[in-house]
Amino acid sequence: MELVVKDVQNVLSVSEIIFARDFNEALIHQVVIAYSASTRQGTRAQKSRAEVSGSGRKPWRQKGTGRARAGSFRSPIWRSGGVTFAAKPQEHSQKVNKKMYRGALKSIFSELIRQKRLIVFENFSLDAPKTKLLVQKLKDINLKNVLIVTNKIDNNLFLASRNLYSVDVKDVHSIDPVSLIAFDHVVITVEAVKRIEEILS
């Protein structure tokens, strides 16, 4: 299988086992859900009626006052009382096997190629860490919402992209299924493609 290298008008031979897989929607869905769940902090916490401060005595006697009966100052229906079903810190991460994760990435890359959303460059870099240079570079190739994947993080690219909400820069070791799906296009260098082949083979 061959991919067109845009900036040098050349072709790059890649493995069909990795870049020509069928689209496995169920697998990708499972991996994306698991990845998204693992990014949750899970640190929310509220106090139940057993944990809020306050006396344990009965506010007033059961009968004879004309008021509604009450048994505790910490009742959830009282102001400053506890929360009925108090949220507690929770671990949300889900287990995904390496084979499944890699299979999902292969399927995503294959679909990006089929949809012509994966654009390969021999070299994609900037002379200085300037946002306007990156904006102009993307304008020249008619791209807006884009993920840029390089073999190693290019400091100029990284700094130039930080102020652009529709552009992200990652190296091959930090790509994830959600980022690959979220952007309209993925710009990737030849070195990065070769490294991804090594990782996923």
UniProtKB/Swiss-Prot annotation:
PANTHER family: 50S RIBOSOMAL PROTEIN L4 (PTHR10746), LARGE RIBOSOMAL SUBUNIT PROTEIN UL4M (PTHR10746:SF6). It comes from Buchnera aphidicola subsp. Acyrthosiphon pisum (strain APS) (Acyrthosiphon pisum symbiotic bacterium). Signal peptide: none annotated. This is Large ribosomal subunit protein uL4. It holds the Pfam family Ribosomal_L4. One of its GO terms (biological process) is translation. Keywords: Ribonucleoprotein, Ribosomal protein, RNA-binding, rRNA-binding. Part of the 50S ribosomal subunit. Belongs to the universal ribosomal protein uL4 family. GO terms for molecular function: rRNA binding; structural constituent of ribosome. GO terms for cellular component: ribonucleoprotein complex; ribosome. It comes from the Bacteria. Residues 44-68 are annotated as: Disordered. One of the primary rRNA binding proteins, this protein initially binds near the 5'-end of the 23S rRNA. It is important during the early stages of 50S assembly. It makes multiple contacts with different domains of the 23S rRNA in the assembled 50S subunit and ribosome.
